[in-house]
Amino acid sequence: MKRILTMLLALAMIFSVAACGKKSNDGANDKPVDVLTKVWETYKDDEKFAAGGGDANNMTMDGPGKYDVSDVEGLDAQLGFPQASVALIEDAASLVHMMNANTFTAGAYYVSDANEVELLVEDMKDNIMNRQWICGFPDTLIIVGLGDNTVVSAFGNAEIIDTFKTKLLSVYDGAKVLCEESLN
């Protein structure tokens, strides 16, 4: 009897260890600032550029920062997030090129209702594509979905956006490019 019990316990341990072995990372449980931070941390020193993030109250000078979703005008002016869609998100973060935001700007957003993601993507795309650019023109816009409720947008220099997209897709299993458009 002891032998059977020992064997059953050993099998249970083996299966529990195997179940913990590979965990999917689809971004479903990551906060927006964590999403951008995980991607930023994959950049090698020669790939990095002067970048900061966050809003005026959560500003960082060396990487992504939390963005207060109650700053409706700031979300629109700095990240291209449509003011009319702010009610759809609970949390946000940003990563922006410090010399020129049109060279690279990324925002990550947690969408309250997964059923609203498709509508939000269209609103974001329209808002960014219809902007009047003042200081240089970004080349490319991407919007990527992570899990059911997280959306990441980025616009800027085509090469920098391509690097960001590649890194984002490699960090998050199942991430999907929902929009990729030329802004020229």
Residue ranges and their predicted role:
Residues 1-4, 8-9:
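Positively charged n-region of N-terminal signal peptides that target proteins for export
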Residues 21-105, 111-184:
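Soluble, non-membrane globular domain cores that form compact, hydrophobic packing
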Residues 15-19:
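C-terminal motif of bacterial Sec signal peptides marking the signal peptidase cleavage site
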